[in-house]
From Swiss-Prot:
One of its GO terms (molecular function) is DNA binding. One of its GO terms (biological process) is sperm DNA condensation. It is found in: Nucleus; Chromosome. InterPro entries: Protamine_P1. This is Sperm protamine P1. The lineage of its organism: Eukaryota, Metazoa, Chordata, Craniata, Vertebrata. The gene is PRM1. Belongs to the protamine P1 family. Testis. GO terms for cellular component: nucleosome; nucleus. PROSITE patterns: PROTAMINE_P1.
């Protein structure tokens, strides 16, 4: 199954596709692209608050 991962950089709002990796990284990976996009936006918001 292909999973979508949340993008780490703020400039990119897109999420990239990712193959199944080790069980450790399973938490961050999302099953659908929409979920990944949500995760992405949430992270950006939290980062902005910190600064």
């Amino acid at each position: 199954m292909a999973r979508y991962r949340c993008c780490r950089s703020q400039s990119r709002s897109r999420c990239y596709r990712q193959r199944q990796t080790s069980r450790r990284r399973r938490r961050r990976s999302c099953q659908t692209q929409r979920r990944a996009m949500r995760c992405c936006r949430r992270r950006n918001r939290l980062r902005r608050r910190k600064h």
